[in-house]
Every structure is written in C-alpha cells, then in structure tokens.
Amino acid sequence: MISYNLSMEFKTIIEPFKIKSVESLPITTPEQRKEYLERENWNVFGLRSQEVTVDLLTDSGTGSMSSEQWAAIMRGDEAYAGSHSWQRFHEVVSDLTGYKHIIPTHQGRASEKILATITVKEGDIIPSNSHFDTTRANFEFAQAKPVDLLCEEGLDLLSPAPFKGNINLSKLEALLSGEESDKVPFVLMTITNNTGGGQPVSMNNLKKVKELCTQYNKMFLLDACRFAENAWFVSQREEDYKDMEIRDITKKAFRLADGCTISLKKDGFGNIGGVLALNDDTLAEAARNLLILTEGFPTYGGLAGRDLDALAQGLKEITDRNYLEYRARSISYLGEKALSYGIPVVQPAGGHALYIDAKTFLPNIPPHEYPGHSVACEIYLLGGVRVVELGTLAFGVAGENGKPDTPATHELVRLAAPRRTYTQSHFDYVAEVLEKLAENKDKLKGYEVIEQPKLLRHFTAKLKPLI
C-alpha cells in the first residue's frame, strides 16, 4: 500500500485518546444477516443499527464526541436569537475560515440546498473536481448540470500520485473561456475528494483554481467537509507546507475561496450540524432569508444551542496532528491488508475511508448489475460490517424502457471510518472479513433494481440478487 510519511516511532497504531463510555456491539449470525437483508430488499441503508456489528456506512455524524464536547453541551444556551452558543460558534468558524457571513444549518445538504437555490438557475453548469451525491442532487434539482473535471491521475485508481483529488485545470479553463462560460455561476472544489476515493487536493491546485476564477470573474467555493484531513495530507505531501501547522494550512485554504459549505458531521466532530459561509453580502442576505423560511433563525439554523457549542469545540480539536496521523494510518493499514488478500483498492489510501475497486475485483459482473453493491452485501453477510456502494447504483444514470444503466466512471465500495469510534481490534476484524470476501469472490452474483426513486436512488432502492 502506498503511503506518505506515515511512520511513527512504533509500528503499533494506537488511538490517541482513551475511552470514557462504551456501547455494546450487536453480534449476529449469518442466518440472521441474510434475513435482515432480505427484509430490506437487499439495501444496506435499510438495516437497523442493532443489526450491524461494525458500521462503516459513513463517517458523517457517526463519530464519538470528546469529554470537552460533552462539557460544552452543558454550556448550551437555548435562546431563540443571539444565544451565547451562537456567539462561540461564530467566533470559532470565523477565525477558522475568515469568511464575512457565517450561516449555521442542520447539516451539509441543507447548506447545499440553500446555495443551489440562491445561486443557480436552469441550464447552469457547475464545474468541480468531483461532486458528491447530495451536492450533485441539489444542483440537478435546481435544473443545473454538475460537471466533474477530475485530474487525469485521479481517473487511474492505482496511480501513486499524491493529489489525485485535484481538478483538471486545462479542462476547467476551457470551460471558463468557452462559449458556455456565462452559464457557470461558480466553481466548487470538494476537499477531500470523497467521490474520487477520499483523495486530497493540493494547495497549488486550489491556488490555480483561484487564479482562473479571478481571471474569468467567477466565484470560487469549497465543499469543505473534510478540510482538516485535506490539510494533513498537504502537510505530508506538499513541500512548501511540511513545517506548517495543520490549522494554518486550513486557514490558507479557506481564504483562497469566496465561501464554503461544510457538513460539520465530518471534520466538525459533530453528530449533526453544518454551515454555509460567504463573503458576498447580497448572497448572504438571500441565504439568511431562505434559512429563516426553511431552517430557523440565522443564529441557530435548525440547531440547538448545545449542538453549536459542541461543534465549536469540535472545530478546535479536529486539527490535532496526532489524531489526523492516527486516522490516516488506520485507513492505510486496512488498505495494506486488503491488498495482501488480492482485493484491489484505490491507492494511496484516502483520509476517511478505504475504497475497494469492485470493477476490477468482480470483472464478471457488468456495471448495470452493480458489482459494488454485490461486494457491499457480501461484506455484511460475512461479518455484519456495513459499507456502501459508490458506483453505478449511486452515480450512474438509470436506464429507461428496459435499457441498461449508464455506468458511473468507477465501481467503488467505500469503507468509511467513524471518527474516534472504533479501535485497532475493530480494524483487524474488518480485515478478516475482507479476507473471507476474497475467498468467496467467485460466488458473488449481480443484482437488479426492482423499484427506485428518481433522485439519490441508492438510499431507498429495492433490489434482488440475480440467480
């Protein structure tokens, strides 16, 4: 497995925290797990938490809060307007991002929805290194066209390139200088690039995007859900930033852009929460008006005061170098194990998740039969570990009139690690499940969709295995 300066004094990966409270894990039998999946029409999103032993479905809102965050909850001020909790939250986010207007929301997709509503019109084009599923869906709902312009290195899952989350600058400039430039309201950069395998974006790439946006008079925004993980990779892989504090790198990244959306359920160490931050006064006023209509008053945005305080504290903790190094090493360790079993994974390992290349792993299953979903179901059946497909089921275009789906670029399976939740023993257990997956690969079959919604179908689609 390719890694970058992940060495520590000792080989053992230890959690840089100790456990103060515990929750029992459910242990299920293979027979029970098959029954549960059949009941939910073979969609892992339908599984109940008490039916999952290790839950790697997402790192969003599933992490553990620190004792300082729990203490901050007790300081929560639940005043409807102008609470102390809001003031503390505003101070931390303003210092971190440098943006003029800080608008809290209940989670990231609420920020995306507001942004899409106030900035996008029918026929607009939204370029990005890669849009994630909810981001893409919100822009499509606004009748815009999200366009992914991932760099060439990012398209090669095995490339050792250090910044495979970068945007293709030549393609971006071609769009901004071309006939459809007037259809582009802004450029959105996702850090880290979740869809592209949790890969980081370099500061140099962000600077070049800023230069292009300035040249062509376009707003530059960040989807910054994993801003701290991106900054850690920058500190490891970009020479000019190797001696810089993680928080300082983060501040520089934010200050290149004109605003951002953040799901604080990731690098805010929160179980709920988000933010939309902007410099433009007119857009901020429109955002606040919509916020009042849909989320709540601008000083709480659908969140309790205690949540705002917990998030403010989490945003102080997330840039700890020891924590970020432990997290990256844990994912890299799991990737090394998978490779040793002959399971192809995206390399280098991402910051928040391991991504299995299901297309290469199961070449006998075509994209329209969802090889990634087959892998996800098998991992659950083998060991009660829940993961998610990020391939044609999630990102493809559903076929019409009996025609097969238009496939996604890649067929990936994401194993996303909740923050500060599982120990090294849990990762060893997951590795054993992956070993059994490799042993069973020739037995895996494809799936077909029997019912699906028009948008974000992977969340609620009903499927069945092919015979």
Give names to the regions the model predicted.
Residues 318, 394-467:
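PLP-dependent enzyme catalytic core of the Aspartate aminotransferase-like
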Residues 271-273, 351, 410-414:
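Short, solvent-exposed beta-strand edge segments and adjacent coil->beta transition regions
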Residues 299-377, 382-409, 444-455:
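Conserved small-domain helix->loop->beta segment predominantly found in fold-type I
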Residues 278, 356-359, 417-419:
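Short beta-strand-to-loop capping motifs
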Residues 6-42, 46-48, 52-63, 69, ...:
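Conserved PLP-enzyme active-site core in the AAT-like
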Residues 67-75, 358:
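A short, surface-exposed helix-loop junction/capping segment
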Residues 25, 29, 374-381, 435-437:
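C-terminal, active-site-flanking charged/polar segments
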